[in-house]
Amino acid sequence: MIQMQTNLDVADNSGARRVMCIKVLGGSKRRYATVGDIIVVSIKEAIPRGKVKKGDVMKAVVVRVAKDIRRADGSVIRFDRNAAVLINNQSEPVGTRIFGPVPRELRAKNHMKIISLAPEVL
């Protein structure tokens, strides 16, 4: 569960290393985001010569959450850290590579480009 002020790792090669959620999109009173949801983030840490720089405000898709994700078959999946992938206004990833596993719940939320770039889908 991601809310305002939550720090997340960046799971792509856009140049950002750490971001902070500043808004959960999808309704005026919406408080939490989970896997596949789009959030607005501020870049808190970035590498030199990356595609983005510290202080930029962008959209991101949440790809990993530490909170349990319950599936229809009764199984539960969870990750060690919260992570997101930066996207542009056309909902395409800014980076060209995705690092680490992503859950298949992204497929239901129509983030097929992220699924295809990911090295492993759980």
Swiss-Prot record:
<dbReference type="GO" id="GO:0070180">
    <property type="term" value="F:large ribosomal subunit rRNA binding"/>
</dbReference>
<keyword id="KW-0694">RNA-binding</keyword>
<dbReference type="GO" id="GO:0022625">
    <property type="term" value="C:cytosolic large ribosomal subunit"/>
</dbReference>
<dbReference type="InterPro" id="IPR005745">
    <property type="entry name" value="Ribosomal_uL14_bac-type"/>
</dbReference>
<dbReference type="Pfam" id="PF00238">
    <property type="entry name" value="Ribosomal_L14"/>
</dbReference>
<keyword id="KW-0687">Ribonucleoprotein</keyword>
<dbReference type="GO" id="GO:0003735">
    <property type="term" value="F:structural constituent of ribosome"/>
</dbReference>
<keyword id="KW-0689">Ribosomal protein</keyword>
<comment type="similarity">
    <text>Belongs to the universal ribosomal protein uL14 family.</text>
</comment>
<dbReference type="GO" id="GO:0006412">
    <property type="term" value="P:translation"/>
</dbReference>
<comment type="function">
    <text>Binds to 23S rRNA. Forms part of two intersubunit bridges in the 70S ribosome.</text>
</comment>
<dbReference type="InterPro" id="IPR000218">
    <property type="entry name" value="Ribosomal_uL14"/>
</dbReference>
<protein>
    <recommendedName>
        <fullName>Large ribosomal subunit protein uL14</fullName>
    </recommendedName>
</protein>
<dbReference type="InterPro" id="IPR036853">
    <property type="entry name" value="Ribosomal_uL14_sf"/>
</dbReference>
<keyword id="KW-0699">rRNA-binding</keyword>
<dbReference type="InterPro" id="IPR019972">
    <property type="entry name" value="Ribosomal_uL14_CS"/>
</dbReference>
<comment type="subunit">
    <text>Part of the 50S ribosomal subunit. Forms a cluster with proteins L3 and L19. In the 70S ribosome, L14 and L19 interact and together make contacts with the 16S rRNA in bridges B5 and B8.</text>
</comment>
